């Protein structure tokens, strides 16, 4: 029986754990004990911080694992790459994973490779001199965010200089390394792109249309596949994504790229994660819309058993999230069992909250059908 190490044990990793068990693999999981919902589902669980890469490596060497992976976790990706590199397993280089994890290093790589992205600065304080430098070199409005976090945490749109200092201070407080990204705001529609890579070859899977709260925090409210973009735009975005992945050195596993497309059709890469998209995009929506089991693909890459994806379906899929901003969805949640196409739903809170990050949401509803489900 092959042994698969899984980094992380939150609800985000549950589809990975369940798929590994379905495939008959022996699972060894590492995560903080708090919130480790997968610890009772795996064969072995170690309450080790997912960023303690050397301690995790030690256990993986003792267990002689055959592969290591994670899904939908930016924080876990560098540890996965480090262990794989040290043990001669399939994965991205540790350097590539670190570059993809830090938004500033990522943007520098994009610039060097000619990948279109917004103008940006990385700052480590909100002193007057820093504010002055930003004002002199960039145009409002701006987006301020931590350089090393995800899930819309600490992200804010800044419309005027008076609130810039507070926005940077908040982003620095959210950042693990106390770095904040300041970038010129790009208007237009927001999409994301899912790829899987193996030994340096990249395979496009799907493009997702997004609906967000908009300013100031841009938290996702809906995801829908496939995108309504033209075939020509699909081809352009796939080509840009391949160049961006190569610039980061991402050669193996899933990737999730986020884009903005202006009204004039200009395309900008906002960021790329060396992991599949969260919010059920990678774990559910890709499979429902294309027929390709993305989670299994990630495991196959880690074990060196990857087979080129075959897209067998052309369905629509999507997810609606419940929060104060989308309380109009409450009757649909109450009647979800009778709505054609709904495949899974859950309401986690009775009292809905206004959201500033994805963790504030109170439920989800996933659908599949021949056409987009409009609620």
In which residue ranges do the predicted regions lie?
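ATP-binding N-terminal substructure of ATP-dependent carboxylate-amine bond-forming enzymes
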Residues: 1-96, 126, 306-307, 315, ...
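Short acidic/polar active-site loop segments enriched in Thr and Asp
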Residues: 66, 178, 246
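Active-site nucleotide/adenylate-binding loops and adjacent lid/helix of ATP-dependent enzymes
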Residues: 102-181, 187, 199-200, 227-231, ...
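Peripheral (often C-terminal) accessory segments that flank ATP-dependent C-N-forming ligase machineries
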Residues: 129, 297-375
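ATP-dependent carboxylate/phosphate-activation module, predominantly the ATP-grasp catalytic core
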Residues: 162, 184-250, 254, 261, ...
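Flexible, glycine/charged-enriched surface loops at secondary-structure junctions
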Residues: 252-258, 308-313
């Amino acid at each position: 029986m092959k042994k698969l190490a899984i980094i992380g044990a939150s609800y985000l990793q549950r589809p990975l754990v369940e798929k590994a068990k379905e495939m008959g693999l022996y699972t060894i999981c590492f995560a903080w004990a708090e919130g480790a919902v997968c610890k009772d589902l795996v064969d072995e669980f170690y309450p080790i911080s997912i960023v303690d890469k050397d301690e995790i490596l030690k256990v993986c060497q003792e267990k002689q694992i055959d592969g290591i992976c994670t899904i939908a976790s930016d924080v876990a990706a560098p540890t996965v790459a480090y262990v794989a590199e040290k043990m001669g397993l399939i994965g991205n280089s540790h350097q590539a994973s670190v570059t993809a994890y830090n938004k500033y290093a990522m943007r520098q790589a994009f610039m060097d490779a000619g990948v279109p992205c917004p103008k940006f600065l990385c700052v480590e304080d909100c002193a007057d001199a820093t504010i002055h430098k930003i004002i002199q070199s960039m145009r409002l409005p701006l987006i301020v965010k931590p350089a090393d976090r995800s899930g819309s945490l600490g992200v804010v749109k800044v419309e005027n200089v008076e609130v810039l200092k507070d926005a940077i201070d908040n982003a620095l407080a959210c950042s693990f390394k106390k770095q904040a990204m300041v970038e010129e705001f790009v208007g237009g529609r927001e999409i994301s792109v899912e790829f899987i890579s193996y030994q340096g070859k990249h395979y496009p899977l799907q493009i997702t249309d997004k609906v967000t709260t908009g300013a100031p925090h841009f938290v996702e409210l809906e995801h829908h596949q496939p995108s309504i973009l033209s075939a020509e735009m699909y081809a352009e975005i796939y080509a840009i994504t391949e160049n961006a992945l190569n610039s980061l050195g991402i050669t193996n596993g899933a990737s999730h790229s986020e884009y903005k497309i202006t009204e004039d059709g200009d395309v900008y890469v906002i960021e790329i994660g060396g992991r599949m998209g969260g919010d059920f995009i990678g774990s559910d929506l890709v499979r429902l819309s294309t027929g390709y089991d993305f989670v299994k693909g990630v495991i196959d890459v880690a074990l060196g058993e990857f087979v080129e994806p075959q897209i067998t379906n052309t369905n629509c899929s999507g997810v609606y999230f419940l929060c104060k901003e989308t309380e109009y969805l409450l009757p649909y949640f109450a009647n979800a069992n009778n709505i054609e196409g709904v495949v899974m739903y859950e309401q986690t809170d009775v009292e809905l909250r206004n959201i500033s990050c994805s963790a504030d949401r109170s439920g989800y509803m996933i659908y599949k059908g021949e056409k987009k489900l409009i609620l």
